UniProtKB/Swiss-Prot annotation:
Any one biological process term the GO annotation gives: protein folding
Pfam families, A to Z: Nitrate_red_del
Protein name: Chaperone protein TorD
InterPro entries: Chaperone_TorD, DMSO/NO3_reduct_chaperone, HscB_C_sf, TorD-like_sf, TorD/DmsD_chaperones
Predominant subcellular localization, coarse grouping: cytoplasm
Gene that encodes the chain: torD
GO cellular component, one term: cytoplasm
Gene3D superfamilies (UniProt xref): 1.20.120.1820, HscB, C-terminal domain
Length: 220
């Protein structure tokens, strides 16, 4: 079981890192080209094999297909990113937990909690990401770190604790605000790529928590 769990954790980390990259910065021309490659389309097809993710992956692929016919695709998609994630909160979907859980204020209690968690795990935020620690990209990257770190554990008691910690992080730091974030993305993202990405992130995180809870019961 330990070997199977290590493979699963590597796949989970890969998906979390990928999701993090979508909200980290605007996609470049090279990034967009990769999204049209056979390798990435195969990766997305694999995700779609999960019934709970099928609809959201389908919406993301449809948006990527529309992107191929969008004039000035990179510039327009960068404008979508800016309008959604970098402007004022009134007509946007700011990707910070504090905005949704702490009176709409930036850099609130969730950011402080994330700073403490990152410090406790020795995780440093990438220097060129000048953002509060409760940014969605940072939280997703941290989950990837937790998944990979669990692969260093050899004792079942410690493994159970690591699985519980990941499930708790999802409950306490993501599911408290991600549904509202995804809803705002859907409301304000006219083209639909980032709203599809947000809904897919939510669906995957919900599925992952269910999986973690089942694994915890098996190892506890």
């Amino acid at each position: 079981m330990m070997q199977e769990l290590k493979i699963l954790n590597e796949k989970r980390a890969e998906i979390y890192w990928w999701l993090s990259s979508l909200f980290f910065k605007e996609l470049s021309e090279q990034d967009i080209a990769r999204y049209h490659s056979a390798e990435v389309r195969t990766f997305l097809s694999g995700l779609a094999d999960e019934q709970s993710l099928n609809r959201e992956v389908k919406h993301l692929v449809e948006a990527l297909n529309r992107l191929q016919n969008r004039q000035d695709a990179q510039l327009e998609l960068a404008a979508d990113f800016c309008d959604l994630f970098l402007k004022s909160d009134r007509d946007s979907a700011l990707p910070y937990a504090s905005v949704y859980t702490d009176k709409g204020l930036l850099n609130g209690k969730p950011a402080q909690q994330m700073r403490e968690l990152l410090g406790a795990h020795g995780v440093k935020v990438e220097q060129n990401l000048n953002e509060p620690e409760d940014h969605l990209a940072i939280q997703l990257d941290f989950l990837a770190h937790l998944a990979i770190s669990a692969n260093q554990i050899e004792h079942s008691a410690q493994l159970s604790s690591a699985l519980q910690a990941q499930s708790d992080f999802i409950s306490q730091h993501l599911l408290t605000w991600l549904p509202a974030f995804a809803e705002r993305c859907t409301q304000f993202d006219a083209f639909g790529l980032y709203s599809a990405a947000a809904r897919l992130a939510l669906a995957f995180i919900q599925q992952d928590k269910h999986c973690l809870d089942e694994l915890f019961q098996e190892t506890h």
